[in-house]
A protein has these predicted regions:
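Binding-site signature for planar aromatic cofactors or substrates
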Residues: 1-275
Length: 275
């Protein structure tokens, strides 16, 4: 991963979702711990399973050719199960360079959602040489069991050389191949949705207290959790100036939902003055 200064837990992150203008003063500690763009991009690709594969068209004089594909992550890189009859497969046989665009699904402004474009070269893989390919892919796409053993279907892996990550407005950067290789998906990504729903449905009062006592949003009237990761969580705090983004860091990294619960409880107690 990128070199860090001594004492820096992780690099400063971009502005969380919810800020109306980039000129507004941030109402939280700008040095709060958060995941890197490499980690966020890895997490996004693990969460999703469909994407747009762009190959170089052999038929149309090198024009980019976009195809809808399903994928799974194998050893940190996406694999596809595609037929030799498909146009994108013919393109890859002639030119291995390709890109894969993975987009986050969700409500609201689609441009505020995350997406990442992975660039690299595709390599044809042997089903017989590595049985784990089939296992990993079918775990993600069980319906593919019908055709996974057909002779005209093969696995291809996109070996990522770099990636362009956009996490929404104000969050974007290039992620190098080595940073991609050395990062990991966030361990909370599978449980994040349930944690967020639970906090918003049952513990808004606790989040309001945290905003008032642990950020500059002293006039917070309501708060909604918008994201959570191993390092902390983000909220949209309703203030007199409208919704404002707030990020609060955990004292310790949370590797599962139970650890995240304990960290949130500790923050609530601290905000209330119980500790």
């Amino acid at each position: 991963m990128s070199e860090k200064k001594e004492g820096d837990k992780i690099p400063r992150h971009g502005v969380p979702k919810g800020s109306r203008t980039k000129n507004q003063e941030l109402l939280y500690d700008v040095n709060v711990a958060t995941s890197t763009h490499a980690e966020q991009a890895r997490t996004l690709t693990e969460k999703m399973s469909t994407a747009t594969l762009c190959t170089i068209s052999e038929r149309s004089d090198g024009c980019p050719y976009g195809s809808f594909v399903t994928y799974a992550i194998h050893d940190g890189h996406p694999i596809f199960l595609i037929s030799i009859l498909a146009e994108h497969t013919k393109n890859l046989e002639a030119e291995s360079r390709a890109s894969l665009m993975v987009s986050e699904s969700g409500e609201g402004n689609p441009l505020a959602l995350g997406r990442v474009t992975l660039l690299g070269k595709c390599e044809k893989l042997s089903k017989d040489d590595d049985p784990s390919l089939k296992e990993v892919y079918l775990r993600r796409h069980p319906n593919a069991s019908f055709y996974v053993d057909f002779e005209d279907f093969s696995f291809y892996k996109l070996k990522i050389s770099e990636a362009r990550y956009i996490g929404g407005f104000g969050r974007m950067s290039w992620v190098g191949g080595s940073d991609w290789e050395n990062s990991e998906p966030d361990p909370l990504f599978e449980s994040a949705g349930d944690i967020i729903s639970h906090m918003n449905e049952d513990h808004e009062d606790a989040m309001v207290i945290i905003c008032k006592e642990m950020s500059k949003a002293k006039d917070t009237a309501s708060a909604t959790m918008t994201g959570i990761d191993r390092y902390g969580f983000e909220m949209s705090a309703m203030t007199a100036e409208g919704p404002r983004p707030i990020r609060i860091g955990f004292e310790n990294e949370a590797t599962d939902s139970e650890e995240a619960r304990k960290e949130i409880v500790a923050l609530v107690k601290k905000a209330r003055g119980d500790i």
